[in-house]
Amino acid sequence: MVVDADKKELICSFCSKKQHEVKKLIAGPAVFICDECIDLCTDIMKEESKVALKQITASIPTPQKICKILNDYVVGQDKAKKILAVAVYNHYKRLEYVQSGNNDVELNKSNILLIGPTGSGKTLLAQTLAKILDVPFTMADATSLTEAGYVGEDVENILLRLLISAEFNIAKAQKGIIYIDEVDKIARKSDNPSITRDVSGEGVQQALLKIMEGTVASVPPQGGRKHPQQDFVQLDTSNILFICGGAFMGIDRIIRSRTNHSSIGFAANINIDKEKNNNEVLKSLEIEDLTKFGLIPEFIGRLPIVTTLEELDKESLITILTKPKNAIVKQYQKQFELDDAELVIEYSALEAIAEKALVKKTGARGLRSILEHLLLDSMYKVAELKKQRVTLTKEVVDGLIEPVMTSIISTKLNKKQQMIEDIPA
C-alpha cells in the first residue's frame, strides 16, 4: 500500500500526489491511481489509436489512384470503378474523423450495392480492391447463408472470416471490408405471406441488417454450431464497409414494366422500350424496383450507394482476353512458356471466343473455360514434346480443326533457309 510516511495519507502510485490534492483516488491491489493519471492514460491511448488509424488512412490511395490501379485489371465499368474508389476512400476518411473525437457532424457509413449481369466484373472489382488496400478483406456467398437456428451458415461466420483475414486482430478487423456475392439470391420469394418461413431469403436479409448497420456482434472463433461452449469474440461492425453484389436476373423486366405503365401512350412506349438494351434499362433503376424484386426496404436502406455494371460486348471481352496485367491469354502463354513452348492466338480466334461467351451469356467468367477446353489436348502434349508452337485459329474455335502444332526449331530453320535462298548469287 502506498502511504505518505509523514501524515499516513494515501498517495497515487504513479504521480505521487496525495489524496487531498486530487478529486479521486482509485484503489487496486496494493496500488492507487488518481483521476488525473487516468485522464492522462486515456489521452495517451486515444493518441496511439489516432496514430494507428492515420497509418491506415495514409496508405489508402486517393480515388483517382484507386481507379488507375483498377484500370490495370478490370476492363470498362468506369462508373462502377469511380463509385467504388470514392466510397472506399471516404470510408477511411470517415474513420479518421470519428477517431478524432470531432462530433459536430455525424458521418454515417455508406455500404454499396453492385448490380450487373454474370461475368461483368463485380467479383473481380472486389478482389482487385483487396489487392490495392492494406486492410482485412473477405468474401462471402449469400446463397450459403440461412437464418440462425436452421441448417446452413450463420451470418456471424462472415465476421469470423474477416477476423481470420485480420489474423484475429480485432482492431484491424473492425476497419475491414466484406464483399457479399449473389445477394440477389436472398430476395424474398413471394410478396404474399406464407405459413412457412423464408429462412434463406427474407430471413437472411433480416439477419444481415444489424451487422451491416453497425452492432457489437458475438463471433464464435471456432465456428458457431460445432463448438457451442466456446468463448465468443466481441466485434464492432460500425466501421466495417459492406459491398454487396448480384446479377438480379429479371430486374430489367420490372424496370421496363414500371417505365411503360408510368408513361403516356402505353402501346407506343412498349415498342420504344423494347429497342433499349439492358445496359440502358438498368440506368433507370429505382429503389422501388429492388423492393419489387424481393429486397426488403430495411435491407435496401443499409445500402445507400447503388450502382449498375454494364453487360460486356465483344470488343470488351477481347480486351479482357489480352490487355489487363492478369489477362487470360497472357496467363496461358506463360504456362506454355514454362513448358518451353509457345502459344499463338490469331485475332479471328479471339473474336470467335468472345462470340461464344456472348452466346452462352457467361460474360468474362466464361472466357477461361472456353480457352481451357480448346487448349486441353495441346497442354497435354507439349509437356512431353517441348519446343512446340501451338496456334489457335477461328477454325479451331469453331471446332472444324484441331489446334495447329509446329516445331519451333524447324520453323526457325525454315526461316534461316529462306533468308539464304533470298541472298543474291
UniProtKB/Swiss-Prot annotation:
A GO cellular component annotation in the UniProt record: HslUV protease complex
PROSITE patterns assigned to the protein according to its UniProt record, in alphabetical order: CLPX_ZB (PS51902)
Coiled coil residues, start to end: none
Record-listed ATP binding positions: 117-124
Biological processes, Gene Ontology terms: cell division; proteolysis involved in protein catabolic process
Keyword Membrane: no
Residues that coordinate or bind Zn(2+): 12, 15, 34, 37
Keywords annotated in UniProt: ATP-binding, Chaperone, Metal-binding, Nucleotide-binding, Zinc
Domain ClpX-type ZB: 1-53
Pfam families: AAA_2, ClpB_D2-small, zf-C4_ClpX
Single GO term (MF): ATP hydrolysis activity
Superkingdom of origin organism: Bacteria
Statement: the UniProt record of this protein carries the keyword Chaperone: yes
HAMAP family for the chain: ClpX
Subunit structure: Component of the ClpX-ClpP complex. Forms a hexameric ring that, in the presence of ATP, binds to fourteen ClpP subunits assembled into a disk-like structure with a central cavity, resembling the structure of eukaryotic proteasomes.
Family: Belongs to the ClpX chaperone family.
Summary of the function given for this chain in its UniProt record: ATP-dependent specificity component of the Clp protease. It directs the protease to specific substrates. Can perform chaperone functions in the absence of ClpP.
Matching PANTHER family: ATP-DEPENDENT CLP PROTEASE ATP-BINDING SUBUNIT CLPX-LIKE, MITOCHONDRIAL, ATP-DEPENDENT CLP PROTEASE ATP-BINDING SUBUNIT CLPX-LIKE, MITOCHONDRIAL-RELATED
Protein name: ATP-dependent Clp protease ATP-binding subunit ClpX
Organism of this sequence: Rickettsia typhi (strain ATCC VR-144 / Wilmington)
